[in-house]
């Protein structure tokens, strides 16, 4: 069976409002954390499907659609909200194996709510970014188009591209900073 294409009947604004309602003053840090989780997952799924090695745009589109579905459906379960980082902000985290057996029934239910929130955010972000991601990946394959402008993913840094530049859910200081001043080493 072919999986259904990722389509959303809700928007990023809807998800932001949902996070604000559920998580109040922690909504911003959890939106950023959820975006980083989605970016990490899409990077893994695109890599697993050899997206950069696809021969033509239709093949790349098909692989990207599969990767988006699997990136979101494959989010960790359970997924918990933990305090940590800067100023005690909250973030999503997969519990360690040793912590799994100590989760209470209430904590397990909370973890399912957290996973549903992260899943919805993932679907909205990646469905919205799908065509822009394709453009970036195709441009990356064309030697004369490898000059990167603001908003493009360098070296497959989907975290910075998706979370800080495109969706603007994270500050630049909150995402991986491996694409700065790295243009000299490109082929």
Model-derived features: where do they sit?
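Extracellular/luminal segments of secreted precursors and ectodomains of membrane proteins
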Residues: 3-187
